């Protein structure tokens, strides 16, 4: 009845709904409330604050089918995926939770009732474990549920310390903790393995299917356990494991979801062996990759994006092993959506974006893979021993972008090891070099330790009466300074905005009678705000009163550019997709720069749509609203938070109509209409998966448009027409140029044919083979290929080596007729000559090209050709 995975999921949630639980949707794979966590890896993650007593919800019982990823960081199953029956990068965790409501008795009863009642699993196939001192749980299992005592196994502290046990759960060194009870299923005597707690427990016969954690203590720093006033329950059952049991199979990869994905992958790639482990890897990895992209993660070189990139590339590499010659991975997404059923709502909504992102990464990696595998194969061919050295692994990673885990995978398949210590040492050395290169002589942010807090009044004021609370000169605290001194001035309150969130610091002046300090930049130093600049007039000392005056014009222009980045961010998400997230920005008075995640170049029509959408919002003249609220409330309202930014519990939310809502501490215009005009000046890629837009606003945008118009009019004049006819006239000119190029190429071919007739007569014979070695004058490098083709046809059977040498450049081409390539290879010949003139090259056995940088050595190099050929002909 509940044999399909989809039916099992529904049955679990419905059972707990009937037991008074609130069915809660799976949270994102990107944790929203835990910066310490790379990915959501357990059902309890989204309820962490509930368990800690920091959040109260409208329900005290919950049930979920939570999407989880374990790859990277502490919980990393990547290396085992595909090679074992139960390791995955992606899995679904069925869970029921109690926040101070029911406890051990009900939690145990619910689990047993669902397994033996709803799913009708044979009771004799089940055994349970409890923590060795948890007599309460033992008695519930034995006396209330009726599990025989011999099927209840007490597990002690088996990890070398008090409470360090498979059956004692701890959130950390301190905090909530408690014993747990686990339910195991016996797959039968035909599979090796023993009951939990036995020497053979690592076998596959007895498989844990449900873990029930009883959070009943609060662990203190001294190790003592204090009872919690409201104990809680956290449970988890992997849907893949229970599906395997219900479907009568042993390996998770044999269940319906995986079988559909494996069959589809085999069909796309064109393989018949459905037991191949590479198909398992691909089937697992498409689940984690597709859902990660759907939840907003894009392939990149850092953080979550890098883990995603590694998983995609591992899948592609296994496809390559199976013989895939074209992109295949993204084509599994429709099958995944169908197989996951109701659990794929978010994936279905973002299907197009997911497919595009996976395809783009696959195409990019195809180039890296071919080159990297060639390098790795060469290194392994020369390997002495059974361990690939760390330097080679690092070179593959650093120079060729070949992931370390793929190198380890290839070595593993060949029963070889990887020198991880050597790789880590090479990586550490590179980091230290980078850190040394990034050190500056005067790092004020590191040097100034300012304890004083500065009040910022610059949201509403551009001038303020302030008092000097600290002065710094050359990184040292001073009490006073005279004219000419370069200083950092710290005030008790200031209207100057300190650089933050991409917005540059304000400029302006600090003034008093006979005193003028020109502020060139404003920076944060802890809780203090430092005004960096030069004392132009008079003297100042700690305790002086000054008037702080922000440069209004510069601030206003900066505000135009900052406000429009919010509109740009929202527009990009509307036009390109909700996967777009801000990756960095620079906002100054002259321009704005906005970096964002996207897996391919932005098309011209998409860029125009973004620009038009932003300008539409400017014309709508939305009033900007600013509000302070709790961060969770802000996120609930849909406010965009920037990944990597740290926010206080209270945040400032900036809203522009119903178009944009973001967390932001920067300064802004009053209405979007103040921006006037938005104009994109450039768009391009700055890193894999990261794009950059540069733009201008207001008067700068008007000036940019005027400049473009002037250049267009100048182009029209050069083409002897008006602006309206520029495109047509330019097309005509390009067509004419292409025709002339075609005619020029034909003429060169004729000249080459004529020249070849003359040159063929200069061929000499070596052991009956015609050989032509010639240094040419007055011939362009582009004509060499056609000329050697003509000469080979004229000679019918022979070897040709042509060279051009002038200035500091040498061009070489070698040609060998097909009947002689068994004796002489053009690539070897041209490489031999190139090596003598400071160059290198290669190519096919019948034709190869090379370059060099030492024309003075060319004649000597050409003289070596005949002796070289004598040895081979």
Swiss-Prot record:
InterPro entries (alphabetical): aa-tRNA-synth_II/BPL/LPL, Ala-tRNA-lgiase_IIc, Ala-tRNA-ligase_IIc_anticod-bd, Ala-tRNA-synth_IIc_core, Ala-tRNA-synth_IIc_N, Ala-tRNA_ligase, Ala_tRNA_ligase_euk/bac, DHHA1_dom
Residues where Zn(2+) binds: 562, 566, 664, 668
GO biological process: alanyl-tRNA aminoacylation; negative regulation of DNA-templated transcription
Co-factor(s): Zn(2+)
Compartments in which it is found: Cytoplasm
E.C. code: 6.1.1.7
Reaction(s) catalysed by this chain's protein: tRNA(Ala) + L-alanine + ATP = L-alanyl-tRNA(Ala) + AMP + diphosphate
Cofactor, free-text remark: Binds 1 zinc ion per subunit.
Classification via SUPFAM superfamilies: Class II aaRS and biotin synthetases, Putative anticodon-binding domain of alanyl-tRNA synthetase (AlaRS), ThrRS/AlaRS common domain, Translation proteins
SMART domains for the chain: tRNA_SAD
UniProt GO cellular component terms: cytosol
Enzyme class (EC, first level): ligase
Molecular-function annotations in GO: alanine-tRNA ligase activity; aminoacyl-tRNA deacylase activity; ATP binding; tRNA binding; zinc ion binding
Keywords, alphabetical: Aminoacyl-tRNA synthetase, ATP-binding, Cytoplasm, Ligase, Metal-binding, Nucleotide-binding, Protein biosynthesis, RNA-binding, tRNA-binding, Zinc
Cysteines paired by S-S bonds: none
HAMAP family the record matches: Ala_tRNA_synth_B
The family this protein is said to belong to: Belongs to the class-II aminoacyl-tRNA synthetase family.
PANTHER family listed in its UniProt record: ALANINE--TRNA LIGASE, CYTOPLASMIC, ALANYL-TRNA SYNTHETASE
Domain topic, free-text comment: Consists of three domains; the N-terminal catalytic domain, the editing domain and the C-terminal C-Ala domain. The editing domain removes incorrectly charged amino acids, while the C-Ala domain, along with tRNA(Ala), serves as a bridge to cooperatively bring together the editing and aminoacylation centers thus stimulating deacylation of misacylated tRNAs.
Function: Catalyzes the attachment of alanine to tRNA(Ala) in a two-step reaction: alanine is first activated by ATP to form Ala-AMP and then transferred to the acceptor end of tRNA(Ala). Also edits incorrectly charged Ser-tRNA(Ala) and Gly-tRNA(Ala) via its editing domain.
Name of the protein: Alanine--tRNA ligase
């Amino acid at each position: 009845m509940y044999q399909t995975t989809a039916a099992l999921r529904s049955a679990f949630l419905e059972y707990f709904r009937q037991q008074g639980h609130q069915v809660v949707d799976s949270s994102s794979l990107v944790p929203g409330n835990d910066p310490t966590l790379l990915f959501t890896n357990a059902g309890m993650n989204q309820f962490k604050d509930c368990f800690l007593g920091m959040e109260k919800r409208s329900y005290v019982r919950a049930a979920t089918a939570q999407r989880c990823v374990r790859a990277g960081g502490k919980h990393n199953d990547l290396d085992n995926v595909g090679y074992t029956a139960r390791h995955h990068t992606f899995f679904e965790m069925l869970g029921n939770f109690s926040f101070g409501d029911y406890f051990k008795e009900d939690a145990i009863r619910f689990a047993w009732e669902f397994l033996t009642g709803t799913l009708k699993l044979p009771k004799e196939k089940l055994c349970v474990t409890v923590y060795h001192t948890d007599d309460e749980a033992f008695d519930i299992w034995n006396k209330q549920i009726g599990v025989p005592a011999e099927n209840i196994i007490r597990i002690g502290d088996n990890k070398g310390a008090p409470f360090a046990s498979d059956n004692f759960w701890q959130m950390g060194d301190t905090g909530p903790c408690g014993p747990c009870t686990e339910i195991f299923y016996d797959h039968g005597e035909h599979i090796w393995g023993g009951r939990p707690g036995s020497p053979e427990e690592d076998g596959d016969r007895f498989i844990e299917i449900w873990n029930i954690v009883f959070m009943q203590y609060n662990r203190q720093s001294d190790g003592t356990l204090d009872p919690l006033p409201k104990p809680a329950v956290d449970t988890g059952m992997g849907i893949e494991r229970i599906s395997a049991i219900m479907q009568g199979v042993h390996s998770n990869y044999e269940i319906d979801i995986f079988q559909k994905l494996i069959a589809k992958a085999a069909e796309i790639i064109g393989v018949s062996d459905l037991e191949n482990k590479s198909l398992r890897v691909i089937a697992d990895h498409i689940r984690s990759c597709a859902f990660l992209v759907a939840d907003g993660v894009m392939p990149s070189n850092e953080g979550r994006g890098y883990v995603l990139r590694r998983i995609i590339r591992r899948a592609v590499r296994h496809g390559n092993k199976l013989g895939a010659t074209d992109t295949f991975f993204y084509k599994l997404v429709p099958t995944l959506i169908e197989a996951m059923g109701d659990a794929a709502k978010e994936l279905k909504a973002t299907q197009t974006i997911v497919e595009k992102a996976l395809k783009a990464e696959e195409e990019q990696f195809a180039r890296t893979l071919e080159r990297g595998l060639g390098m790795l194969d060469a290194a392994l061919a020369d390997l002495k021993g059974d361990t690939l050295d760390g330097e080679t692994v690092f070179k593959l990673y650093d120079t060729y972008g070949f992931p370390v885990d793929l190198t380890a995978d290839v070595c593993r398949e060949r029963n070889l090891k990887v020198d991880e210590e050597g790789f880590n040492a090479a990586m550490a050395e590179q980091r230290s070099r980078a850190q040394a290169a990034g050190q500056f002589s005067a790092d004020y942010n590191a040097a100034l330790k300012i304890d004083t807090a500065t009040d910022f009044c610059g949201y509403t004021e551009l001038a303020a009466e302030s008092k000097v609370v600290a002065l710094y000169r050359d990184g040292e605290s001073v009490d006073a300074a005279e004219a000419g001194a370069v200083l950092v001035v710290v005030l008790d309150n200031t209207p100057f905005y300190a650089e933050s969130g991409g917005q540059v610091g304000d400029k302006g002046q600090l003034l008093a009678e006979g005193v003028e300090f020109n502020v060139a930049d404003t920076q944060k130093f802890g809780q203090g705000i430092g005004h960096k600049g030069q004392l132009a007039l008079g003297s100042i000392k700690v305790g002086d009163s000054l008037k702080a005056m922000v440069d209004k014009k510069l601030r206003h222009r900066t505000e135009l550019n900052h406000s429009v980045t919010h509109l740009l961010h929202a527009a990009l998400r509307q036009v390109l997709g909700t996967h777009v997230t801000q990756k960095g920005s620079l906002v100054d008075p002259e321009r704005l720069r906005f970096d964002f995640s996207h897996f391919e170049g932005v098309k011209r029509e998409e860029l125009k749509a973004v620009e038009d959408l932003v300008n539409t919002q400017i014309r709508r003249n939305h009033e900007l609203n600013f509000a302070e609220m709790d961060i969770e409330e802000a996120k609930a309202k849909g406010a965009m938070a920037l990944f990597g930014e740290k926010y206080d519990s209270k945040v400032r939310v900036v809203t522009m109509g119903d178009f944009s809502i973001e967390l932001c501490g920067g300064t802004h215009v009053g209405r979007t209409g103040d921006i006037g005009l938005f104009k994109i000046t450039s768009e391009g890629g700055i890193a894999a998966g990261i794009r950059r837009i540069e733009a201008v606003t207001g008067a700068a945008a008007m000036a940019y448009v005027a400049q473009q118009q002037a250049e267009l009019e100048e182009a029209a004049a050069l083409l002897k027409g008006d602006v309206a006819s520029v495109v047509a006239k330019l097309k005509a000119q390009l067509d004419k140029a292409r025709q002339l190029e075609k005619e020029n190429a034909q003429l060169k071919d004729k000249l080459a044919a004529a020249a070849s007739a003359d040159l063929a007569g200069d061929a000499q014979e070596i052991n009956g083979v015609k050989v032509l070695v010639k240094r040419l004058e007055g011939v362009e490098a582009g004509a060499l290929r056609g000329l050697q083709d003509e000469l080979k046809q004229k000679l019918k059977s022979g070897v040709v080596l042509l060279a051009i040498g002038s200035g500091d450049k040498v061009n070489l081409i070698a040609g060998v007729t097909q009947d002689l390539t068994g004796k002489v290879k053009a690539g070897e010949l041209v490489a031999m000559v190139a090596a003598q003139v400071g160059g290198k090259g290669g190519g096919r056995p019948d034709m190869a090209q090379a370059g060099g940088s030492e024309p003075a050595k060319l004649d000597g190099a050409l003289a070596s050709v005949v002796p070289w050929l004598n040895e081979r002909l």
